Amino acid sequence: MCGIMGAVSERDISKILLEGLRRLEYRGYDSAGIAVIDSQDRLKRVRIQGKVQNLADAMQETAIAGNTGIAHTRWATHGKPSEQNAHPHLSHGEIALVHNGIIENHEHLRQQLITYGYQFTSETDTEVAAHLIHYHYQQHENLLLAVQKAAAEMQGAFALGVIHQKRPEELVAIRKGSPLVLGFGIGENFIASDALALRSFAQSVIYMEEGDSACVTTQDIKVYDSNRILVQRAVHPLNSDSEIVNKGPYRHFMLKEIFEQSKVITDTLESRINSIDVLRASFGEKASHIFPVVKNIHIVACGTSYHAGMIAKYWLESLAGLPTQVEIASEYRYRDVVVPDNTLFITVSQSGETADTLAALFKAKQSNYLASLAICNVATSTLVREADCVFLTRAGIEIGVASTKAFTTQLAAFLMLAAALCKDNRAQEVLRQLQELPACCERVLQMNEEVESLASLFVNKVHALFLGRGVQYPVALEGALKLKEISYIHAEAYPAGELKHGPLALVDKDMPVIAVAPNDELLDKLKSNLHEVSARGGQLFVFVDDSQNWKANGARLIKVPSCGAWLAPIVYTIPLQLLAYHVAVAKGTDVDQPRNLAKSVTVE
């Protein structure tokens, strides 16, 4: 969500901060700002509503420069998107603060600070933090201690970066429930909400642990734990290769990432399967002891990852015979859960920092689960550190807010898990099909131009209906989510068998209905449902197996290359991604950074 960048250097850091923000744009934001302490120890700030480029233009007009500073991209939570609510926020013109997260007790703290004489100029919870730190600094004249004491009074999940004009040589950071990274350079050190922002600037990084605070100077970074005790944290080398964040020949990151799926699935499978078995060590050292005694499975995730879990339920129950329950993390964490004996708890997240998913994992660790397994794309994430077992997908950095390659690698991971838990020879057929999956994806990507030709038929639509049966129902859900995320068309998905129970009332000559129709045991049932749509004049678009002889009957048939039955949910996802992409491009929306959305949802 919000992006934080900060630096203390022997050189001017304004351009470094700006470049860091550019690398964080993918997280989603509505405003941006920067604050630096200049050579005369004056605190200078520039804020704008809109894009980072607008901030760059404004910075040129003010000639802002300095050796210590912080910068921020804001995704609105408290207070509307505006320059007034943009970060950094100031207190008494001395303290500047950037913030990612939510301070839940901000109203109580605001009233308390008003009684102390503080005045507020914004609608944000962030300004509360700035004034509270100023209050404690007045008592102690120690910026690190002031930040630590203020954070102890604040409830919620947040990360802060703070500078003080009277302390131009230092930058203070603290993390409570929201990720923050410390970066080591030469004659300069950094903070950021994502290591991606530090590539080519920092040589190595520390991933702050829960409750950590840090004092950053040009010469050193000192880290303190939640008890304010000086500690040593692991230092990790940082890959400075920036090519991975370039679009290359593609117009958008999303299209690039769609076309990377064959490669990243190959990478995810590599050295983890052969023709007869799944290497259980791929799921962590404990997996070989845990898997044989699993009797039930609970999967908890959000958004696209939740859809991956829904598909996995079909595979795990069919192949492994294990009762599987799938829940949305924000619902799971607030209800009483009955945990059967020997239940494996699985969390799924691209970033490994999704707030509700992490909270669900922490809740599960206090419950009677056999063990926890995290399926995640980021090796250094909190989710990975906290789980008993881990499967790392190898999707690489995903910039587009609408997830594509992260989703299909999650599905590949789940299909491997189902094969690993399967107790009969069907596992070998699954493994054979998995080895064919990258080639199947390549063939499907050749449909790009055909799918693009459909886009004009959707440009003026307001609604769309997606249908699937069985394991293809979650695929339809994912297709609908992609279309609504980036084209802003209201799209819903239903099991095709539910048409007569309500959704059929929506079907008319203006309603596009998209169906996912692989050659499986439910195909004839699906055809009957689609006849109901045709009979009512619905605009029917059917993604069909190219080996099938369909009678169009007024429907637009889009033929998908044949694939193994176990692979169909993965393969049929790709043309739906392409459809959403091309419709969004035709409508002129911001494909990589759709309105109101964030890449990594790090607040509740």
UniProtKB/Swiss-Prot annotation:
InterPro entries in the cross-refs: GATase_2_dom, GFAT, GFAT_N, GlmS/AgaS_SIS, GlmS/FrlB_SIS, Ntn_hydrolases_N, SIS_dom, SIS_dom_sf
Catalytic residue positions: C2 (nucleophile), K599 (for fru-6p isomerization activity)
EC number: 2.6.1.16
Gene Ontology terms: biological process: carbohydrate metabolic process; fructose 6-phosphate metabolic process; protein N-linked glycosylation; UDP-N-acetylglucosamine metabolic process
Localization of this protein: Cytoplasm
Main location: cytoplasm
Pfam families: GATase_6 (PF13522), SIS (PF01380)
Domain SIS span(s) in chain numbering: 279-427, 454-594
Residues annotated as domain Glutamine amidotransferase type-2: 2-219
Known catalytic reactions: D-fructose 6-phosphate + L-glutamine = D-glucosamine 6-phosphate + L-glutamate
GO-annotated molecular function: carbohydrate derivative binding; glutamine-fructose-6-phosphate transaminase (isomerizing) activity
Enzyme superclass (EC): transferase
Keywords assigned: Aminotransferase, Cytoplasm, Glutamine amidotransferase, Repeat, Transferase
GO cellular component, one term: cytosol
Its biological purpose: Catalyzes the first step in hexosamine metabolism, converting fructose-6P into glucosamine-6P using glutamine as a nitrogen source.
Subunit details: Homodimer.
NCBIfam families reported in the protein's UniProt record: glmS, PRK00331.1
Protein name per the record: Glutamine--fructose-6-phosphate aminotransferase [isomerizing]
Species of the source: Legionella pneumophila subsp. pneumophila (strain Philadelphia 1 / ATCC 33152 / DSM 7513)
Lineage of the species this protein comes from: Bacteria, Pseudomonadati, Pseudomonadota, Gammaproteobacteria, Legionellales
